[in-house]
Regions:
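Secretory-pathway luminal glycosyltransferase catalytic domains
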Residues: 3, 34, 38-137, 149, ...
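A structural signal for short, well-ordered beta-strand segments and their strand-loop junctions
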Residues: 5-6, 33-38, 102-104, 140-142, ...
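A short glycine/serine-rich beta->alpha loop
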Residues: 6-11, 178-180
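A short, glycine/small-residue-rich beta-strand->loop->alpha-helix junction that serves as a flexible
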Residues: 8-18, 112, 118-121
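Short, flexible loop/turn elements at secondary-structure junctions
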Residues: 10, 107-109, 143-146
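Catalytic phosphate/metal-binding cores of nucleic-acid and nucleotide-processing enzymes, i.e., regions
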Residues: 18, 23-30, 38, 95-99, ...
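Non-transmembrane alpha-helical segments in soluble domains
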Residues: 24, 128-131, 152, 193
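Donor-binding and catalytic core of enzymes assembling or modifying cell-surface/extracellular glycoconjugates
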Residues: 136-221
Length: 253
């Protein structure tokens, strides 16, 4: 009898949620406990599923700290999700209006020198098409900074969009309160929406893998496969940045 041991956190919050979810899934399948480092958004450092196992019992670690874990056991996923939710510090977020929209645009380090070549962000036309195809009341935009050129371009097109650079916790609460969400690319939205009691509709690019398929949620996919191929590998060149904000491919004129 052992403890599943997350020795360290890898990357950002979205990745950390994946690490913990994977560790819990393994622990539930084996009736083990979970040891993890302190984290601002997790209320526990020890998850006890088996009282016969102590914190000083044998520890099982993973070279990837359970971020990349293949062949996860097929078990009661609802139990895994409930344990995960119990660990998260932000709870009971009130829903936004059903006709409001929250857009998350990934920015940050992928717009610096030597970015990850696989992190290709959707173009401006992706967001504009979604807005034009619907009649949303209030549109909220979430981003960590304004390095992604789509952010300022979208704000220029739609000055009434609600946007401010704010602490991560406020962004999380907006995401968890959202009924309608637009995802860009990365693990943050998929991971955070595991904790949502309000989400009904998720817009996402076709080349973005659905990490966790949520029940009773409508997924609306925009075909951006050709765009993705034309932008690979991502180098953050001026040509690529210009292509991101080119509106020649709009579906809804």
């Amino acid at each position: 009898m052992s403890n599943i041991w997350i020795k360290g956190w890898s990357g950002r919050l979205g990745n950390n949620i994946i690490q913990l979810k994977n560790a819990i899934q393994l622990a539930v399948s084996k009736n083990y406990n979970v040891i993890m480092p302190r984290h601002k958004y997790f209320s526990k450092t020890y998850i006890c599923l088996n009282k016969q196992i102590g914190i000083n019992s044998k520890r099982i670690s993973d070279p990837n700290n359970y971020f990349y874990t293949s062949d996860l056991p097929n078990i009661d996923y609802n139990r895994v999700l409930q344990i995960l939710k119990d660990c998260f510090t932000i709870k009971d977020v009130k829903a936004l209006d059903a006709e409001d929209l929250v857009i998350h645009i990934r920015s940050g380090d992928i717009f610096d020198k030597d970015p990850h070549p696989g992190y290709i962000m959707p173009p401006l036309s992706y967001y504009v098409d979604i807005i034009r195809a619907n009649t949303f009341k209030i549109i909220y935009l979430i981003a960590e900074d304004q390095k992604n050129p789509c952010i300022n371009a979208l704000l220029k097109l739609y000055p009434t969009i609600q946007f401010e650079l704010q602490p991560l916790e406020k962004d999380i609460r907006l995401i968890l309160g959202a009924v309608n969400v637009v995802s860009s690319y990365g693990s943050m939205i998929d991971s955070l929406l595991l904790f949502s009691n309000n989400i009904k509709r998720i817009y996402r690019p076709s080349y973005s893998t659905i990490l966790f398929k949520l029940e009773s949620v409508e997924y609306i996919i925009t075909d951006l496969d050709e765009y993705k191929e034309s932008m690979s590998p991502w180098r953050n060149t001026q040509e690529q940045l210009d292509k991101m904000i080119n509106l020649s491919n709009l579906q809804y004129i």
